[in-house]
């Protein structure tokens, strides 16, 4: 085992631990301590852990690095199917265009996860705008029920304009979720029009 792998091993554990601690702190504040405690435990499974050590970067997710080099990540395929705080968990391309409204506790865990990852990877460069700017790009490449999209959009825009403490508020998130995801009775369907294209 090379020195680089050994170094990455400990750095990855430190990074994941920092991320989990922040998620737990946010989760406790928002009334879902159990979700914070159980958050991302699959990262310590063989399939996820060793790929993450191999592609550890410190500035971006190892999953992102692996995707950049290989076009896909086995760790991500394993992770998204076991963690309900990811929008990808709730998408089944074999269904007739229905993406469910993600339950409240998992969307709140998602917010905690996104905030923690953004703060962890951006470090001193993190600002109230960081997550909103990332979300604007991310929402273009994922499938998520528009009600959840509207909810996240409103929360991250509020973060950008008014700061972290304004959104780390249980009452605010419950009211915003209710407005966007429960009171809105609109039904949505998506059309998947994927097709293979030859490269080279």
Regions found by a protein language model. Name each.
Residues 1-200:
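Metal-dependent phosphohydrolase cores
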